[in-house]
């Protein structure tokens, strides 16, 4: 990215968070494992280290609050072979609440990076 990004450009990337509460809750049924689409999974620390190695600094993170509900709904279906809207909704609320109150983070996070000076 560094070569093609303008001087004040930003890199915006959204990734699932394998350290989130819902990832631990659903384990192998967590829908955001999503192989082969997601080949690697990152926490805040690991994605920050990766971009830092390539001369970028993290300037902001944002939780993808609605993604927790979607991932929970899909995970419920993977786990039980049934669409469980209420369970998925409740798990989404729990995951977002824990993610916002702890350092675990939400199910998915948006990271905004810029070049280091």
Q: For the regions a protein language model found, what residue spans apply to each?
A:
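S-adenosyl-L-methionine-dependent methyltransferase catalytic module, highlighting the catalytic core
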Residues: 4, 10-114
């Amino acid at each position: 990215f560094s070569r093609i990004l303008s001087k004040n450009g930003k890199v915006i990337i959204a990734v699932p968070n394998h350290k989130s509460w819902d990832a631990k809750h659903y384990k192998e049924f967590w829908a955001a494992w999503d192989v082969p689409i997601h080949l690697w999974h990152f926490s805040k620390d690991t994605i920050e280290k990766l971009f830092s190695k390539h001369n970028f600094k993290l300037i902001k993170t944002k939780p993808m609050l609605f993604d927790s509900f979607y991932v929970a709904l899909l995970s419920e279906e993977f786990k039980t072979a049934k669409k469980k809207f209420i369970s998925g909704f409740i798990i989404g609320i729990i995951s977002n609440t824990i993610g916002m109150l702890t350092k675990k983070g939400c199910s998915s996070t948006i990271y905004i990076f810029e070049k280091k000076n």
